[in-house]
Amino acid sequence: MSQNKDRPVVFVVEDGDGTRQLSCLVLESYGFTCRSAGSVEEALTLIESDPRVDVLFSDIHFPGGLTGVDLALKTAHAPYNLPVLLTSGLAVEYVEEILPDGVAFLEKPYTPEQLLTAIRSVMAKRRVLATPGV
């Protein structure tokens, strides 16, 4: 996974190796740099060591331990202030009940185009919020 300073960095957190690799392949084909982790704990360690991330894209459920919601709560605010997009195959009604404020959601299964649209939307919202006077 190459890193280019001009390319936005998406951090993908997914316990399914195939899904994680496919997500990175899709994102890289659209011009993003992809970093990834197979667990919330691994993601937190990697983000702490190198916080250069433009969007966090994470599954919600992981076996044991912390969830994607926990990860969103830890990274969507200071010191990281990351835009977060969570994903799950669970019923949307359930997810809406547990989704933290300001965190976007993409229902599984999704197409590469839906993933790209969701990532760009999350990035655009964050830019608008960060613009003074807007």
Model regions and ranges:
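Non-catalytic signal-transmission and effector/linker regions of two-component phosphorelay proteins
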Residues: 1-11, 17, 24, 41-42, ...
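Charged docking surfaces used in two-component/phosphorelay signaling
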Residues: 21-29
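Acidic, metal-coordinating helix/loop segments flanking the phosphotransfer/catalytic sites
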Residues: 24, 36-55, 63, 95
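Conserved dinucleotide-binding and phosphotransfer motif residues
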Residues: 29-30, 78
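Two-component signal transduction core modules
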Residues: 56, 105-106
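Conserved phosphotransfer microenvironments
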Residues: 59-73
